[in-house]
Design a protein with these regions (language model features):
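Membrane-interface helix starts
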Residues: 8-23, 334-336, 454-469, 725
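Juxtamembrane non-transmembrane "cap" segments at the membrane-aqueous interface
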Residues: 279-286, 355-376, 430-437, 668-679, ...
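Short, membrane-interfacial amphipathic segments enriched in basic
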Residues: 1-4, 190, 432-450, 579-581
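Transmembrane helix boundary and interhelical loop/hinge segments in multi-pass membrane proteins
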Residues: 221-236, 240, 244, 612-627, ...
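Secretory targeting signals
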Residues: 24-85, 153-228, 249-329, 383-384, ...
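Membrane-helix interface segments
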Residues: 16, 243-244, 333-338, 634-635, ...
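Central hydrophobic cores of alpha-helical transmembrane segments
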Residues: 22-24, 335-348, 467-474, 725-738
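Alpha-helical transmembrane segments of multi-pass membrane transporters/translocases
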Residues: 17-20, 31, 316-324, 349, ...
Length: 797
């Protein structure tokens, strides 16, 4: 117990841990609020109290009576919309139609008509009610249809099993049909109710919280395992017979306890924020009352389901915590810990998000730690897995697999902690390298600060491996071609047109367009002739017409896009712009691609988070920071030498990640269209002289400035934390996680601002990046050199 309390104090006494915890809570709350405070949710947020009152009112009525009253009110809003349309139109035919419809409403639905008249006299002040009435009517329709959904389950299974695909009684498909019907039959008499489920659903579906919790668990592991290793304290944990055993047990118990507390805390905060936004949810209703959980076969209330959701989060984070503990015990290198831990978790996330439900790899999707963390899907949906042609419910299988993983990680963590030397020692490859260097490499005795720092970064901290990997990645990625998938049938024909037309508008190209126009006019004329030809049979007419329609629906649509582009280019040419034909599909994605922009920048930030912390933290780790005072400006020169090393690393990483795509693009499509004005592709561009290559250069400059700011922020964190692993974790919270959140926002990227002429946003981003870089650089310089300054002042005094 004393060891447990000591380990707890060791974590809680660290100000950085508390700062990161509250920072994560604040960022998570802000991102949750931002994700809910959208234009689509505006009515729900504004009138949440009124919506709750309406639900209370209708839930007290029988469903049939409530449906009848709601239908009448919805009809009143429909009649009101006809009044509005009649008042706004001046078309005589529409006026006649609206007048006739209103007379029919007045005759057949006098109550609804009178209510619509009253609404019109008030000016439609309560139009928001229409939205909520429709929502409640959908809930009532769902409640009324649910018994039929359950009753027909067995009939559907019987009907499907009669087909040849499902007829084999020993197959998974056959067993799955009847197991599903039997499992749902237990819900036959489930009572459903109207409920305001907005806060409940928003809490269940918000998954970004898991990333924050994983980051905090990673930080806890740093304090429990890496901190003592870097301080060289593990050699002292042998003073009693069971010193290491008791120590690792205390560490693991504390890790699991803190992980569960943090996980519950985040879910509680999420539910509190959503309740504040949308109003409370009646947690006493059956979970099937919420239409999103129609497929849930658990006989639980909404409150009990919320507890199961929290339990799933805790179990999932237990498994991740045990795996992180094992990684921290096995590896002594901070970079290997970071890459192995987050790399494995990231791979699991990719499997869960990218593998389809019906894929032959779906076991990797569902026997997955993120399937557990997604508690709403884990407990809220019905899924049977194919285990040796048997239909087995996914929940016990997943629990069994990850329960085993948890036990194995925990047991091996205890064994390895007790048996292995936890002090950081040189590995076999490091020893072989030292022998090789002693025979074939002689030190030149250089006193250059830059050479010394570059040597420490590349050789001592093994970042030469990362640089080599980046160079290899750049070389390999430069080969190949760039291909854009066709989203429509006409895209291939449009590309064929652009391959011929691309470039300046010439008389030859204009004649070609005229020929194509005549060709499609003749096709239209031919369609009419076929329809009027009495000598052809109906089958022949249909076959010939279908053939022409296929041409018009693919090549014809593509040519319509060409004509639209041609007319727009002629208008631009009249304004004195050097208008050119260009493939809009290809170059729109080339200039502004949400996925490529954020993937490249997120990967660049990840590379920086792995490498940059080693530049400054090494001096604190080996205690050399106190010896760097041989001259008056020794620390200042050393500081800028380290900054130069960071900038070189940044430049290598940026070049390796960004340049290969442009090399492949030019190899595929050439460089002829790079000087085409951007306004030829995007109509919103205000600067008419801005070309494609200008947009690309601006994009790269902005991202390089952002990356520079990120580099200096990581440097500042490493100087304050004095630990490479702490820096990686905190930088992940400050940089990587916000990037994942920003990915969901379409207009929060440089490419979008460039093509929409948001010049102010671009300039402000550049200025803010430069300001952050300068401020963090000055703070880092002051912190790194403050010991020397105070010693000099004391000496002079």
């Amino acid at each position: 117990m004393k060891l447990f309390i000591y380990e707890l104090k060791k974590v809680l006494n660290k100000k950085i841990f508390l700062v990161v915890l509250f920072l994560c809570l604040a960022i998570n709350g802000f991102l949750l609020y931002s994700s809910q405070n959208t234009e689509e949710n505006n009515l729900r947020l504004t009138y949440s109290d009124e919506y709750a009152k309406m639900l209370d009112n209708y839930s007290s009525m029988p469903c049939d009576e409530a449906k009848k009253q709601i239908d009448n009110e919805l009809l009143a809003y429909e009649i009101f919309s006809r009044f509005e349309s009649l008042a706004q139109t001046d078309n005589e035919e529409l006026i006649e139609n609206y007048t006739y419809e209103l007379e029919e409403y007045k005759k057949n639905n006098p109550t609804a008509y009178q209510k619509a008249v009253e609404m019109s006299e008030k000016g439609g002040e309560e139009l928001w009610k229409n939205y909520f009435l429709y929502d409640i009517s959908q809930q009532i329709a769902y409640i009324n249809s649910y018994p039929d959904f359950i009753d027909q389950m067995y009939d559907r299974a019987k009907a499907q099993s009669s087909s040849s695909i499902f007829s084999d009684e020993n197959s998974f498909s056959y067993k799955n049909l009847y197991k599903t019907a039997n499992d749902y039959s237990e819900l036959k008499n489930t009572e459903l109710s109207l409920v305001n489920s907005d806060a409940f659903i928003a809490t269940i579906k918000y998954s970004l919280t898991d990333i924050f919790v994983i980051a905090i668990v990673l930080l806890i592991c740093v304090y429990l395992f890496q901190y003592e290793r870097e301080k060289g304290l593990y050699s002292l944990v042998r003073c009693t017979k069971f010193g290491r055993a008791k120590t690792i047990i205390s560490k693991l118990v504390l890790l699991f306890a803190l992980a569960s507390v943090v996980s519950v805390l985040f879910v509680f905060c999420n539910f509190t924020i959503n309740t504040f936004l949308y109003g409370g949810t009646d947690l006493s209703v059956n979970i099937q009352s919420i239409s999103e959980f129609r497929n849930c076969t658990l006989k639980v209330t909404a409150g009990q389901f919320l507890l199961l959701f929290v339990l799933a989060k805790v179990i999932g984070i237990f498994v991740i915590s045990s795996f992180f503990a094992l990684v921290f015990i096995v590896f002594s290198s901070s970079a290997m810990m970071y890459l192995t831990g987050l790399g494995t978790v990231g791979t699991e996330y990719l499997f869960y998000t990218l593998i389809g439900q019906n894929s032959f790899l779906n076991l990797l999707k569902y026997i997955n730690i993120f399937y557990i963390l997604d508690g709403g899907e884990f407990f809220g949906s019905y899924l049977n897995l194919n285990i040796f042609s048997n239909a087995v419910t996914s929940v016990p299988i997943v629990f069994a697999v990850f329960g085993t993983v948890f036990l194995l990680c925990t047991v091996f963590s205890c064994i390895l902690f007790c048996k292995r030397n936890q002090q950081k020692t040189a590995g076999i490859f490091s020893r072989l390298l030292e022998k090789f260097k002693s025979k074939f490499y002689t030190l030149n005795g250089s006193t250059s600060i830059f050479k010394g720092e570059f040597y420490k970064f590349t050789v001592q901290n093994k970042m030469a491996v990362m640089i080599v990997l980046l160079v290899l990645f750049a070389i390999i990625s430069s080969f190949g071609t760039v291909r854009y998938p066709y989203s429509e049938n006409s895209d291939a024909d449009y590309k064929a047109y652009m391959e011929y037309l691309e470039g300046d508008i010439t008389s030859e190209k204009e004649n070609y367009i005229l020929e194509q126009q005549n060709y499609f006019n003749n096709l239209q004329q031919r369609m009419g002739e076929i329809a009027e030809n009495s000598e052809l049979s109906e089958n022949a007419k249909q076959a010939m017409s279908k053939s022409i329609e296929n041409i018009l629906n693919s090549k014809g649509i593509a040519f319509e896009r060409v004509i639209e582009q041609y007319n727009r280019l002629l208008e631009l040419d009249k304004k004195g712009i050097d208008a050119k034909f260009i493939d809009e599909n290809i170059y729109k994605s080339f200039v502004s691609s949400k996925t490529r922009e954020w993937n490249n920048f997120a990967l660049l930030c990840l590379v920086l988070v792995i490498g940059v912390p080693y530049v400054f933290s090494v001096e604190y780790k080996n205690g050399m920071i106190n010896l760097i005072r041989t001259t008056e400006n020794s620390k200042t020169k050393l500081f800028f030498g380290k900054i130069v090393v960071e900038c070189i690393y940044l430049l290598i990483a940026f070049t390796a990640l960004y340049v290969p795509y442009f090399v492949r693009f030019i190899n595929t499509y050439g460089a002829n269209s790079l000087n085409t004005p951007l306004v030829c592709i995007f109509e919103n561009v205000q600067e008419t002289s801005f070309s494609v290559i200008n947009a690309v250069v601006v994009n790269l400059i902005c991202y390089f400035l952002l990356a520079t700011a990120v580099t200096f922020v990581i440097s500042a964190v490493s100087i304050f934390t004095r630990s490479s692993m702490f820096t990686m974790v905190i930088s992940t919270v400050l940089v990587i996680i916000p990037l994942l959140a920003l990915y969901l926002i379409e207009n929060a990227r440089i490419g979008y601002w460039v093509v929409n002429s948001h010049i102010i946003a671009i300039v402000m981003t550049c200025l803010l990046s430069i300001l952050i870089a300068i401020v963090t650089l000055e703070i880092s310089k002051f912190k790194f050199t403050e010991t020397r300054i105070w010693r000099r002042i004391n000496a002079k005094a």
